[in-house]
């Protein structure tokens, strides 16, 4: 009983829901053997002829290539492409390719030299001695992809499911109408196909190998049975003709009774599927050492006079193949790449043949019928009954038309195999597959954008984390670099803090003004005197500018001013040295009397200078103003020295001096002295060059200010013991009044001058 059940299960096939039975139209092209097509003059080889990214170019314009020479390098899902013939690379540029969008893709354009020379081919007839990895790598580098229409890299497919495959299925169903490429290949090359199947079985080591073929291919079935009569482990399963039984999920269910899970792959249930054309290409790559450079293409339709199946080089323009088949182009020719249900209309006839091109259908106008107007959906559910994937096409149609991407995804739009069965049975002539393709493209674009946004966010977050780590590292370095101050540094800091506290304590103490003391306003007085001197100097300069100087033999005024300043400085130094000699023991002298006597002495000295000056006036010799200034300075120095010598010693018992009267008398004396100097100066004016009045005035003002400061210091008694009984406010008021009166006397003296 168990053997009977096993034998029954061995030949059993299952069925799938849905499906249709359209007219097959295969007899137009499957009756003639495969033939070669003449080599075109120019071939266009797109760099991307598979699912995945295009490879890296390894040729450039002007290079000479041989047939089978790699044009790109490929890793992972980047599948290399090879030169289909020998010739010269004339261009590497975008070109329209075989895609429903009609977009241009980067392509290598080769001008054939007609020699069709191969590269050196190295076949592995002893492939059983090769490792699985070496065989998979050879298949990948020789550019083998799925030739059934998907174009998935075969090497990647074998590498991904090599450890868990229990059943290897060879798809020989070829269910779509008009297409007979696999049928004719099995009739003419059955032995090579079986060799390719054995290579796959050697790589995958499955428990069983199944070949699924529809019962509408009797010649191919007989040829395969003849080759498989002595083969072990390979079973041929003939299945009923039903569209789309050639779909991967549908054929898997038919042969094994298992369904591929939603969102999964056939390898999840231990099944791997390859096309018969792919098996043939694997045999040529491994045993013959020939990369994939050509494939079988069906040329059919009522618009061609010689339909059939041909060996077409990859990159051959569609126009060249159709012309070889006797294509009769109409005013608006329509050529479909693929079958009438899953194919697409080509944007032009210069599109090249690629690895997934299995059929070129050129129907006549009567064969395709008149285009029908699209009408509204009547919800008849005919599309749902015909769907082999158990979907709801009418709901997907509404979601796709309304841009409801989330709902379309929730209704498993990704499981649609785009077989066209729903559109075939639709009574409203709605092109459902077109809506589904567009919706898939939009969802894919949205997901790519979301992925890019997620990657950008991840990069931003990684950057922020890196910046935070760097900031923390810098802070840690700064923390480690910071050291405690040394003992001497701490001592210096403590000393500075103590000085600050002392200053604050001193600043907080009240200020006590001593009775009878005058504030030291010498700097302010000097500044005022300097401003007045500058004004007088500007006035004198303006007056001197209007007078012409008849002689150039006069003395240099700058030199005279310098010498006078030096003399005054020496006199002040002598005064400072002589002042404190006998101060502690000298008898007290009335400072007013001393000031008056000093003023009288200065006046007499100036008068003597004035008397000497007129005596020499008649003489032609000019008076030296520098000498006169020096003598005057010496006289003033002697007067100050006399004043300092008679400075009060016993200030605590002396009567306080009236500062106002002393200041007035001193101002009057200075005014008279300046007047005497001005009267004596112009004796030789006609012959002497004028001294720089601004410098002289400034120096004179500074000298007077310093003399006044010395007088104030000498006149101020030491009243430290009596300061407690005097009123400081009265003393400050008296000092201010004295300053005002002195300023007034000075202004009057200037006006008199």
UniProtKB/Swiss-Prot annotation:
Name the record gives this protein: Ion-translocating oxidoreductase complex subunit C
Q: Which GO terms describe its cellular component?
A: plasma membrane
Q: What does this protein do?
A: Part of a membrane-bound complex that couples electron transfer with translocation of ions across the membrane.
Q: Does the keyword Electron transport apply?
A: yes
Superkingdom, according to UniProt? Bacteria
* 4Fe-4S ferredoxin-type domain span: 367-397, 407-436
HAMAP family attached here? RsxC_RnfC
Q: Where in the cell is it found?
A: Cell inner membrane
Q: Which gene encodes it?
A: rnfC
Q: What EC numbers are recorded for this enzyme?
A: 7.-.-.-
Keywords of the record, alphabetical order, are: 4Fe-4S, Cell inner membrane, Cell membrane, Electron transport, Iron, Iron-sulfur, Membrane, Metal-binding, Repeat, Translocase, Transport
Question: Ranges of Low complexity compositional bias?
Answer: 610-622, 644-656, 712-735
Recorded topology in the membrane: Peripheral membrane protein
Entry similarity comment: Belongs to the 4Fe4S bacterial-type ferredoxin family. RnfC subfamily.
Instruction: Give the region (Disordered) as residue ranges.
Output: 517-561, 606-625, 640-659, 705-735
The record's section on PANTHER family has: ION-TRANSLOCATING OXIDOREDUCTASE COMPLEX SUBUNIT C
Q: Which GO terms describe its biological process?
A: electron transport chain
Note the Pfam families from the entry: Complex1_51K (PF01512), Fer4_7 (PF12838), RnfC_N (PF13375), SLBB (PF10531)
Give the organism the record lists. Answer: Klebsiella pneumoniae (strain 342)
Q: Where is the composition biased (Basic and acidic residues)?
A: 526-537
């Amino acid at each position: 009983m168990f053997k009977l059940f096993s034998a029954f299960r061995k030949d059993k096939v299952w069925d799938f829901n849905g499906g249709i039975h359209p007219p097959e139209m295969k007899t137009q092209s499957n009756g003639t053997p495969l033939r070669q097509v003449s080599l075109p003059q120019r071939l266009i080889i797109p760099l991307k002829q598979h699912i995945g990214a295009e490879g890296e170019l390894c040729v450039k314009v002007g290079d000479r290539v041989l047939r089978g020479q790699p044009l790109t390098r490929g890793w992972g899902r980047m599948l290399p492409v090879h030169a289909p013939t020998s010739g010269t690379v004339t261009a590497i540029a975008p070109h329209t390719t075989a895609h429903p969008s009609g977009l241009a893709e980067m392509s290598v354009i080769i001008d054939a030299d007609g020699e069709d020379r191969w590269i050196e081919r190295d076949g592995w007839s002893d492939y059983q001695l090769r490792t699985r990895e070496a065989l998979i790598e050879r298949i990948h580098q020789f550019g083998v992809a799925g030739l059934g229409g998907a174009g998935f890299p075969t090497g990647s497919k074998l590498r991904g499911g090599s450890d868990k495959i229990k059943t290897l299925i060879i798809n020989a169903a070829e269910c779509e109408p008009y297409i007979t490429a696999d049928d004719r290949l099995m009739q003419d090359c059955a032995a090579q196909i079986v060799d390719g199947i054995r290579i796959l079985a050697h790589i995958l080591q499955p428990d069983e190998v199944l070949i699924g073929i529809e019962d509408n291919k009797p010649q191919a079935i007989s040829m395969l049975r003849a080759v498989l009569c002595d083969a072990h482990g390979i079973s041929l399963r003939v299945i009923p003709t039903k569209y789309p039984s050639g779909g991967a999920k549908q054929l898997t269910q038919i042969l094994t009774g298992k369904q591929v899970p939603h969102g999964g792959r056939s390898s999840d249930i231990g099944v791997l599927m390859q096309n018969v054309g792919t098996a043939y290409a694997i045999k040529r790559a491994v045993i013959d050492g020939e990369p994939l450079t050509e494939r079988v293409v069906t040329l059919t339709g009522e618009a061609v006079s010689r339909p059939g199946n041909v060996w077409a080089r990859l990159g051959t323009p569609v126009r060249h193949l159709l012309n070889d088949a006797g294509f009769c182009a109409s005013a608006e020719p329509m050529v479909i790449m693929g079958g009438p249900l899953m194919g697409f209309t080509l944007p032009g006839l210069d599109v090249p043949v690629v690895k997934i091109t299995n059929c070129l259908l050129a129907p006549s106008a009567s064969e395709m019928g008149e285009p029908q107007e699209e009408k509204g959906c009547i919800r008849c559910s005919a599309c749902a009954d015909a769907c082999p994937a158990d979907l709801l096409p009418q709901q997907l149609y509404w979601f796709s038309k309304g841009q409801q991407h989330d709902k379309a995804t929730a209704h498993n739009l990704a499981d649609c195999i785009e077989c066209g069965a729903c559109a075939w049975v639709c009574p409203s002539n709605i092109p459902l597959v077109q809506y589904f393709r567009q919706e898939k493209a939009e969802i894919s674009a949205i997901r790519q954008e979301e992925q890019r946004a997620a990657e950008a966010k991840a990069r931003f977050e990684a950057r922020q984390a890196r910046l935070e780590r760097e900031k923390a590292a810098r802070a840690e370095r700064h923390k480690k670099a910071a050291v405690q101050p040394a003992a001497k540094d701490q001592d210096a800091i403590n000393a500075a803090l103590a000085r600050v506290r002392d200053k604050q304590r001193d600043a907080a103490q009240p200020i006590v003004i001593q009775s009878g003391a005058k504030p030291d306003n010498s700097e302010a007085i000097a500044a005022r005197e300097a401003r007045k001197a500058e004004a007088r100097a500007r006035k004198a300069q303006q007056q001197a500018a209007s007078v012409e100087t008849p002689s150039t033999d006069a003395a240099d005024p700058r030199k005279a001013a310098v010498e006078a300043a030096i003399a005054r400085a020496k006199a002040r130094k002598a005064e400072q040295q002589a002042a404190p000699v006998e101060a502690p023991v000298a008898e007290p002298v009335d400072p007013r009397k001393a000031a008056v006597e000093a003023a009288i002495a200065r006046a007499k000295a100036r008068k003597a200078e004035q008397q000497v000056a007129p005596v020499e006036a008649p003489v032609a010799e000019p008076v030296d103003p520098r000498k006169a200034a020096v003598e005057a300075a010496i006289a003033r120095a002697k007067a100050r020295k006399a004043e300092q010598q008679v400075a009060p010693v016993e200030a605590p018992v002396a009567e306080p001096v009236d500062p106002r009267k002393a200041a007035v008398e001193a101002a009057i004396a200075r005014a008279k002295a300046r007047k005497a100097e001005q009267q004596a100066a112009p004796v030789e004016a006609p012959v002497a060059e004028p001294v720089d009045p601004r410098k002289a005035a400034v120096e004179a003002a500074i000298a007077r200010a310093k003399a006044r400061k010395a007088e104030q210091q000498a006149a101020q008694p030491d009243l430290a013991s009596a300061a407690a009984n005097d009123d400081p406010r009265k003393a400050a008021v008296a000092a201010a009044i004295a300053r005002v009166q002195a300023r007034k006397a000075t202004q009057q003296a200037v006006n008199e001058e």
